[in-house]
Amino acid sequence: EENRHKLLGYLYGAWDYVKNSGKFPEAANLVLDWVGSVPGRRESRRFMGDYILNENDLTKFTHFDDAIAYGGGWSLDEHCPGGILNDKEPASYFHQRFEKMFEIPYRCLYSKNIDNLMFAGRNVSVTHIALSATRLIAICGLMGQAAGTAAAMCMEYKVSPRGIYKKYIEELQE
């Protein structure tokens, strides 16, 4: 609850600045009519899978034989990687749009060192920059569907998630 209040304070403080600083006359007639009741965090723990998806994979449109999800409707974007209160390093910000769809490999959805641990969503095996394009709800949903299907296949075939990659990836991709 304390963090929620802090985050809402930052949001309302930024809105107050935009509306009342005089530096944004185009905002004079704008209103803030809705704010989510639970502010979300962009970053979370990310686990290490057999493959760590990175920025180059996304920008060079690397093809993966074990692709289970696709993205590209949103750009790569980074801002304030150290957090909004970090005054030790300058804030960075960039957007890079995609020319076509990128692929997310199944190997990002299971642990490289813990049997039967799978993940989907913001905790998948990606770098900080790759997360900026893979964190979106639709892509997380695709990864969740793939992880759930793979988990069912693990039970059916009596194999680990890695076993699905080695023997049954084409069936998972159907």
Question: Language-model segments: which ranges?
Answer:
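Flavin (FAD/FMN)-binding glycine-rich loop and adjacent Rossmann-like elements that form
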Residues: 1-174
